[in-house]
């Protein structure tokens, strides 16, 4: 079967049309193929006219995401005159919302793409959280919006990732007795540092369950009451030394703790 020609015409990058076409194409067997040509950043009649002529020559389906009413009207009239199939993705909904709200649309190309900048910031924050998870690189402590400290199993990593999804750059560092702390930590402003803790009994239970899940014996320092108690005491000492805000994460969901942190920083 000959590939079906499709022209995407947009005054932005045409990603909205591409996504819709991909979703529709997935509903057909592999024998149905599309020849997609994308024409982005079309902002004047001079550029638009030859594209429409080429579409006519190829008998293409035109998929448009033009926010400029004048340009879209040109496409509509051309398709009607030449009997071309036109899929106008934006105009029907734009008109409906405009009529219902009694408000004219902005006709600003790329508005959705500008919103996508928020997405890229979030991805950057998540990459930051992965790079500086578990004290992998202490240099991240100085670049972070939030620094999480705590002994093992106090939810440092899941909290880091959740907060990163809220656009915060988060680094976390495990507190282990007799392991020197990086010098960078003492340069971080106190208001950025959050100490995570919980009662000894709760932490012991969590660690014991962790060992059971891994099929490991319970007779290790990891779940020894005295050792774990010493870890918590050491962590509290560091929190006090750094003047860090301390949060008891026991019986709190990740979402609840993250929300509390956001109100504190």
Swiss-Prot record:
Pfam families: Kinase-PPPase. It comes from the Bacteria. InterPro entries: Kinase-pyrophosphorylase (IPR005177), PPDK_reg (IPR026565). It catalyses: N(tele)-phospho-L-histidyl/L-threonyl-[pyruvate, phosphate dikinase] + ADP = N(tele)-phospho-L-histidyl/O-phospho-L-threonyl-[pyruvate, phosphate dikinase] + AMP + H(+); N(tele)-phospho-L-histidyl/O-phospho-L-threonyl-[pyruvate, phosphate dikinase] + phosphate + H(+) = N(tele)-phospho-L-histidyl/L-threonyl-[pyruvate, phosphate dikinase] + diphosphate. GO terms for molecular function: ADP binding; ATP binding; phosphotransferase activity, phosphate group as acceptor; protein serine/threonine kinase activity. Transmembrane segments: none annotated. Its EC number is 2.7.11.32, 2.7.4.27. ADP binds at residues 150-157. Keywords: Kinase, Nucleotide-binding, Serine/threonine-protein kinase, Transferase. Belongs to the pyruvate, phosphate/water dikinase regulatory protein family. PDRP subfamily. Bifunctional serine/threonine kinase and phosphorylase involved in the regulation of the pyruvate, phosphate dikinase (PPDK) by catalyzing its phosphorylation/dephosphorylation. This is Putative pyruvate, phosphate dikinase regulatory protein 2.
């Amino acid at each position: 079967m000959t590939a079906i020609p499709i022209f995407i015409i947009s005054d932005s990058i045409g990603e909205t049309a591409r996504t819709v076409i991909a979703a529709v194409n997935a509903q057909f067997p592999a024998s149905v193929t599309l020849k997609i040509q994308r024409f982005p950043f079309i902002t004047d009649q001079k550029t638009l006219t030859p594209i429409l002529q080429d579409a006519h020559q190829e008998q293409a389906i035109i998929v448009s995401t033009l926010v400029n009413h004048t340009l879209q009207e040109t496409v509509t009239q051309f398709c009607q005159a030449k009997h071309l199939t036109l899929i106008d993705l934006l105009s029907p909904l734009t008109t409906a919302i405009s009529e219902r709200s009694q408000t004219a649309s902005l006709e600003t190309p790329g508005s959705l793409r500008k919103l996508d900048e928020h997405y890229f910031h979030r991805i950057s924050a998540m990459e930051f959280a992965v790079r500086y998870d578990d004290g992998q690189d202490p240099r991240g402590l100085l670049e972070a919006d939030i620094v999480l400290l705590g002994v093992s199993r106090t939810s440092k990593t899941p909290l880091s990732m959740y907060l990163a999804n809220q656009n915060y750059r988060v680094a976390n560092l495990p507190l282990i007795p007799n392991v020197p702390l990086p010098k960078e930590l003492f340069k971080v402003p106190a208001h950025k540092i959050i100490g995570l803790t919980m009662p000894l009994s709760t932490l012991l239970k969590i660690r014991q369950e962790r060992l059971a899940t891994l099929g490991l014996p319970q007779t290790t320092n990891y779940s020894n009451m005295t050792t774990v108690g010493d870890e918590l005491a050491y962590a509290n000492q560091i929190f006090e030394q750094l003047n860090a805000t301390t949060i008891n994460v026991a019986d709190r969901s990740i979402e609840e703790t993250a929300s509390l942190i956001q109100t504190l920083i």
